[in-house]
Amino acid sequence: MRKLTSFVCGTGAGLAVYYLQRLRDPQATVNNSWTNSEKPVDPWALWDTNWDCREPRALVRPLRNSQPEEENRYNAELEKAKAKKARHIILVRHGEYLDVGDSDDTHHLTERGRKQAEFTGKRLCELGIKWDKVVASTMVRAQETSDIILKQIDFEKEKVVNCAFLREGAPIPPQPPVGHWKPEASQFLRDGSRIEAAFRRYFYRAYPDQEKESYTLIVGHGNVIRYFVCRALQFPAEGWLRISINHASITWLTISPSGNVSIKYLGDSGFMPAELLTHRIPRDAKNVV
């Protein structure tokens, strides 16, 4: 009996010490999942709210004091600087083309590339979008793709903006590097500055006086579109080459009034027959011209 009493007392004391220690342990309460934490796993995951330099707080004079008149002035200016509507930017890669000759003038769409552009034009027409602006790269393959699409959608060809900033190029050295494609450092410097300028030209939240959602169609190139996607979503831009998009595919990005950016489609080409799905440049004219 004495042994049993000693055992019970010892066990009880041990349990008491254990639970007391658990209560004192700062890690006694944990989240069920890392996604429940309000703190990002990596500081680089933090969203830059002023990425386009149009965050309302960055556009108005800061508070000079805590007087009601000054606070009213600040709040009124802040409200006036806020965007009200979203901007939708739809990016279309050119159709398949034949890489022959030393100049852009010889890089015309293949027959398959023209069919791809026709399907894309029909798809954009089916979406029923009222376009506010259509922009096309000045390279031949993008111009030909744009011309075919314009026959399908409700937009006047004379209003198309031709932009040399959108021409294909090498935006930034990719990570990881690839052995089959190694442009000179000077090409990255030249093309990268131009493509970044194109991004800043077309990607920004709406102006405060925009009263309805806007839709901009941009017909461009694979490298440029992939770079735009990484920049818009604030992913490391060096990762652009990890993305693959088909010829004449549709990528849809939305910039909300708050400045947040979301992607609706990435390289969508599911509206085409399987035999028209391509993403590489054919090196032989046989059966493609």
UniProtKB/Swiss-Prot annotation:
GO MF annotations, alphabetized: kinase binding; phosphoprotein phosphatase activity; protein serine/threonine kinase activator activity; protein serine/threonine phosphatase activity
Residue ranges of the TM segments: 7-23
RNA-binding among keywords: no
Subcellular localization, as worded in the UniProt entry: Mitochondrion outer membrane
UniProt cross-references to InterPro entries, sorted A to Z: His_Pase_superF_clade-1, His_PPase_superfam, Mito_Ser/Thr_phosphatase
A Pfam family it matches: His_Phos_1
SUPFAM superfamilies, per database record: Phosphoglycerate mutase-like
SMART domains in UniProt: PGAM
The UniProt record lists the keyword Hydrolase: yes
Enzyme class per UniProt: hydrolase
Keywords: Hydrolase, Membrane, Mitochondrion, Mitochondrion outer membrane, Transmembrane, Transmembrane helix
Catalytic reactions on record: O-phospho-L-seryl-[protein] + H2O = L-seryl-[protein] + phosphate; O-phospho-L-threonyl-[protein] + H2O = L-threonyl-[protein] + phosphate
GO cellular component: mitochondrial outer membrane
Record-listed E.C. numbers: 3.1.3.16
PANTHER family assigned: PHOSPHOGLYCERATE MUTASE-RELATED, SERINE_THREONINE-PROTEIN PHOSPHATASE PGAM5, MITOCHONDRIAL
Function: Displays phosphatase activity for serine/threonine residues, and dephosphorylates and activates Pk92B kinase. Has apparently no phosphoglycerate mutase activity.
Assembly mode: Interacts with Pk92B/ASK1.
Protein's name in the database: Serine/threonine-protein phosphatase Pgam5, mitochondrial
Organism name: Drosophila erecta
Lineage of producing organism: Eukaryota, Metazoa, Ecdysozoa, Arthropoda, Hexapoda
Gene name of the record: Pgam5
